[in-house]
Amino acid sequence: MADDKKTNDYTVEMDKLDQGSKNFEAPLPPVQPRSAPNAQLANNPILPVLAYCGSSIMMTVMNKYVLSGTDFNLNFLLLCVQSIVCIVAIQTCKASKLITYRDFNADEAKKWFPITLLLIGMIYTGSKALQFLSIPVYTIFKNLTIILIAYGEVLWFGGSVTGLTLFSFGLMVLSSIIAAWADIKHAVESSGDATAKVSTLNAGYIWMLINCLCTSSYVLGMRKRIKLTNFKDFDTMFYNNLLSIPVLLVLTFLMEDWSSANITRNFPPADRNGIMFAMILSGLSSVFISYTSAWCVRVTSSTTYSMVGALNKLPIAVSGLIFFDAPVTFPSVSAIVVGFVSGIVYAVAKIKQNAKPKTGVLPTSNPVSASSQSMRDSLRS
């Protein structure tokens, strides 16, 4: 029957031809649809993984470049610029129909505002810690936040911690101890004022501790609040950045020095354009992280995304050794390796826990929204 149909498609009925014409056109064979090259490229799993890793590295390096300037002290201004850039970027993407999120609603904003305050505390303390610590040490210490979140889940949401997860936590603590010891050892043995260097490191560790507490509070609070609002990927990013702008503006004008001398010190004429470009690029990179993380989950899987997040710590830490003067010593490299292994073990523990029937779930066991993940990635990187 199928063969008859094929034959009929190409049969010319002679009695229906115009007798005065010697030419006729037979029906063309059906054209087989071909996938567009752009679609094939967009569904290539390697591309979103590389884009996600590159965005995370760019965010951390740009922030460190701005914050490592001589006596930079306008952290609230930096965060405000990043939020404004982010809002402009996602509004442009929404107008271009690249992404979608719900329109502003005053009632939803009121419910979400406490989470925004926790976010401001998280990103501000993260910027202060990154200002005093090297990128590798900062990346290693951010792992401790995972422990706080996990046990917060156990206390407030009925989560559970497996033996393999506990082992990864032990590796995280060990890597942090090695990193701190390597940092202090290098400060004492290097030339210059060792006391001042150790004092700077101690300030960084204090800010890092506060940041871990703020980050875990933000993540746990967001999980509870998101049930009331049912926010999705870019809804969270939109409200977080929009609501933080007025708060950051008030904080920068009230608490930071806006004298002409301090502005010149923070933005020296020789580096002014580079610093401003880095501030804008760091704001854009948060959008890139959010978009590429959602892309990565869509094209690959949440399991692959978890492993990419764990493996991503290594290139981020190495970027600090390449682009900045982070000490390259055996203890510092050992701390990076142990921290890297702890991330892999934790990712494997999450995957195994997801494969079992769930009586309780760790905070990052289920796929989280891309915007929430990007916020954590950008500041734990």
Swiss-Prot record:
Main location: Golgi
UniProt-annotated glycosylation sites, renumbered to this chain: 262
Membrane topology of this protein: Multi-pass membrane protein
Superkingdom as given in the UniProt entry: Eukaryota
Lumenal topological domain: 62-71, 128-134, 183-200, 255-274, 325-327
Quaternary structure, from the entry: Homooligomer.
NCBIfam families assigned to the protein according to its UniProt record, in alphabetical order: nst
Protein name: GDP-mannose transporter
